[in-house]
Amino acid sequence: NINPQDIESIEVLKDASSTAIYGARGANGVVLVTTKKGKEGKVTLNYAGTVTFSTLHDVTKMMNATQWIDYARLAAYNQGLYGDKNQDFAPDYEGDVKLFGGQADSWANINQAWVDGTYHPELVGSYDWASHGKQTGITHEHTLSASGGTDKFKGYGSFGYLEQKGVQPGQSYQRFTLNTSFEARPVDPLTLGFTMNASYGTQNYGYNFSKSVTGPGDYYNALNSMIPWTVPYDSDGNYIRNPWAYNVNVINPIDELKYNTNKRTNFRINGSAYAQFDFGKVWKPLEGLQYRIQFGPELQYYRLGIANAADGINGDGRNVAQYNPSNKVAWTLDNLVYYNKTIAKNHRIG
């Protein structure tokens, strides 16, 4: 939820250093992210923008249509459901009609491989299901920031926008960020400061199959797992629910994006107000001794909304909706004492 353009530094604390400051919460280590602050000088405006492209590259080796048909035939033959069990296994037209011929448009891809009673595997047709589950992902991010100040007052502010189109249809992310920080020194020993980071993001998660009929997984993998010789639409362009009629659990997922919504919204504000007093600027013997009190509130609102229409696989004949909101309010109050002293140029206490 932090704009990368606002990050000044990242520090990892572990072991005693993390528990000394954060107690039990820091037992597994702490990652400190320091955001940018104002610097002395004239006010400067800065813009940073990026555009990136991404693609889904799948190295999984899948069976082609001919290979799949051969394995399905052999499985049926071993169960006594294909050909003549008293003869050696071989392609059989009548067996193919019984096993694969329930849906005419899908069957056409196999039927065309039978010429004059002879099976020609190189003539089997196939359909590229996976092509419907991929697209070129585009991400563009823009940040406008301003910084400046004097030795008495410094300020920094930025506004960021990110939009991402995922490599799968139906997936997207949009985020707005706001970062402000001010630091003032009204009198020499005292420093006052305030920082705030706010973000608002919406994510379209895309389709996730939760029913066992097609197999759980995302949209691309559901499509990529479909039987390669089957087709999603008939010759008139109508949707085919069961492309392989022999198995009613194989359901066509190609239109599922129309029937399902899976959206998350997240709004978050982190703030920090602090005062730091340098005792060394009041009395020379206390040089290096500083006290800091810091208050950090955190507000978060999260919402998950899922809707599955009755016509979809997850809906399974019923309109189903799920709405889960959550709110979080937390704060920390730190009282910190620092002492850093160098003695005889080579010895440092702190």
Regions found by a protein language model. Name each.
Residues N1-K14:
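Short acidic/polar hinge/loop motifs at secondary-structure boundaries
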Residues M62-I69, Q174-T177, F209-Y219, Y302-D316:
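Flexible, surface-exposed loop regions and adjacent strand-edge segments
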Residues I10-E11, V31-V33:
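Non-catalytic regulatory/gating segments with a bias toward low-complexity or hydrophobic composition
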Residues D15, T52-L56, L162-G166, S199-Q203, ...:
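Structural signature of outer-membrane beta-barrel domains
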Residues N1, K37-P169, Y207-S210, E256-K263, ...:
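Residues embedded in well-ordered regular secondary structure
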